[in-house]
């Protein structure tokens, strides 16, 4: 297989991927803050890094994949108080919902899914190292802050100097900070906050800042220097910049070799956000569309490109995925093993090894589907199913998918079968006008009938 090249945000270019330990990859991806339902932006992070995880394994790497859960922060404390429940009750419920969404989207569970509240001792240890290295200080308000001016490499991920960052970023004024860009490592507790949101430390009762959580969990589980760190583009600054400052400031070692960031999800060319009111949860979308359609919609775009969300784009993805499943419906492809020496597989691998170029990889799947339709080749069908499987696609029985589709009001499977039986009776009675009417009515309802040799009729949703 070809050498893998990945766009490294830190270097601002594609680079050959060379793991720290030959044959092994250690990867960390920033996960969810569990106080609300996951939205389509979260779905993109899930699917993109699941795709990366799957391809690394397909390429023969032994992957250790860590994705954290943020189960303590201001929003969580606030939401639990609003609901009149404990923080644990709130986060447990939304972790379950997150897992349900991820499972529906075909996400392979990470090897480790650390919760921030289980790693507070490691966070305190890391803050202590930063203080000992002269990079952290306790402010007059009780918070422990990171002193960005004392870390020479601050800004290297975003490519901005401290002066640029101070001028261009919205930084909340705080007289207790030595620099407006300084960020909280340990947040001093307030009397009004619940006991389960506070831990004891040498700096007093409090809780960890958001950024220190990821540094502590990633370094504990993957080591102080690991291969890949991923997340959404919105995390590049300040979150990932601050992770670098914390981790390298404590260890004196390079933190991560390759930084990967997926692009935003946009609605009508605006970033999806609650404030703009163009916000869709995964659950809302899955009421309307099959989960594999949503996964396919995400994978048709390059992971670094903006992804424009609309019903029209999802409908187009549904039709396209239907074409792929239709190519497999009359074949018995057997096993899923890929022949990587075959021409289509080589093109597919070349695309995936070029910074995970899924649009090109998906185009290879359509080329294979055309060959299956043209020749009925079981070899091509096996390749189609096997290659798609590396993307988490085409893993269901084709007929199951083809009789699903968009989840809208329409005839149920039993109603469709009843109408097919009525059409068969009409044809037997030579009432072809009635048979044609039934076919036309079903087509208007989005149901396509296909008459097979021997008198059988199959159906699928358009």
UniProtKB/Swiss-Prot annotation:
Subcellular location: Cytoplasm
Documented EC number(s): 6.1.1.16
Broad enzyme group: ligase
One Pfam family this sequence matches: CysS_C
GO annotation, biological process: cysteinyl-tRNA aminoacylation
InterPro entries reported in the protein's UniProt record: Cys-tRNA-ligase, Cys-tRNA-synt_Ia_DALR, Cys-tRNA/MSH_ligase, CysS_C, Rossmann-like_a/b/a_fold, tRNA-synt_1_cat_dom, tRNAsynth_Ia_anticodon-bd
Cofactor note: Binds 1 zinc ion per subunit.
Highest rank taxon of the organism: Bacteria
SMART domains given in the database record: DALR_2
Keywords of the record: Aminoacyl-tRNA synthetase, ATP-binding, Cytoplasm, Ligase, Metal-binding, Nucleotide-binding, Protein biosynthesis, Zinc
Short motif ('HIGH' region): ranges: 32-42
Family to which the UniProt record says this protein belongs: Belongs to the class-I aminoacyl-tRNA synthetase family.
Database matches in HAMAP family: Cys_tRNA_synth (MF_00041)
Protein name, as recorded: Cysteine--tRNA ligase
């Amino acid at each position: 297989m070809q050498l893998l090249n990945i766009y490294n945000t830190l270097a601002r270019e594609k680079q050959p991927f060379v793991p720290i330990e030959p044959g092994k990859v250690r990867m960390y991806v920033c996960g969810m803050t569990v106080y609300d339902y996951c939205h389509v932006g979260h779905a993109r992070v899930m699917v993109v890094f699941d795709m990366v995880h799957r391809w690394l394994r397909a390429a023969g790497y032994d992957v250790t994949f860590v994705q954290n859960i943020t189960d303590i922060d201001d929003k969580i404390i606030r939401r639990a108080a609003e609901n009149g429940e404990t923080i644990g009750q709130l986060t447990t419920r939304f972790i379950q919902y997150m897992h349900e969404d991820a499972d529906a989207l075909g996400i392979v569970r990470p090897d480790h899914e650390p919760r921030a509240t289980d790693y507070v001792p490691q966070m305190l240890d890391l803050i202590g190292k930063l203080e000992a290295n002269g990079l952290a200080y306790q402010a007059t308000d009780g918070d422990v802050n990171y002193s960005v001016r004392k870390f020479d490499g601050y800004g290297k991920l975003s490519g901005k100097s401290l002066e640029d960052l101070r001028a261009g970023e919205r930084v909340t004024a705080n007289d207790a900070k030595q620099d407006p860009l300084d960020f909280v490592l340990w947040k001093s507790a307030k009397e009004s906050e619940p006991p389960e949101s506070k831990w004891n430390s040498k700096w007093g009762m409090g809780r960890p800042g958001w950024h220190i959580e990821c540094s502590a969990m990633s370094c504990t589980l993957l080591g102080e220097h690991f291969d890949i760190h991923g997340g959404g583009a919105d995390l590049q600054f300040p979150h990932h910049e601050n992770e670098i400052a914390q981790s390298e400031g404590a260890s004196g070692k390079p933190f991560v070799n390759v930084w990967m960031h997926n692009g935003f999800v946009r609605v009508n060319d605006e970033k999806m956000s609650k404030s703009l009111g163009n916000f869709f949860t995964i659950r809302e979308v899955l009421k309307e569309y099959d989960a594999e359609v949503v996964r396919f919609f995400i994978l048709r775009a390059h992971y670094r490109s903006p992804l424009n969300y609309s019903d029209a784009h999802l409908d187009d993805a549904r039709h396209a995925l239907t074409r792929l499943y239709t190519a497999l419906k009359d074949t018995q492809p057997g096993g899923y093993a890929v022949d990587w020496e075959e021409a289509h597989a080589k093109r597919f691998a070349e695309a995936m090894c070029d910074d995970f170029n899924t649009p090109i990889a998906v185009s290879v799947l359509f080329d294979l589907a055309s060959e299956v339709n043209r020749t009925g080749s079981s070899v091509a069908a096996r390749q189609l199913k096997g290659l798609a499987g590396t993307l988490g696609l085409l893993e269901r029985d084709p007929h199951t998918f083809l009789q699903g589709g968009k989840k809208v009001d329409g005839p149920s499977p039993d109603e469709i079968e009843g109408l097919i039986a009525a059409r068969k009776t009409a044809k037997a009675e030579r009432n072809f006008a009635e048979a044609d009417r039934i076919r036309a009515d079903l087509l208007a309802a989005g149901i396509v009938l296909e008459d097979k040799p021997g008198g059988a009729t199959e159906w699928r949703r358009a």
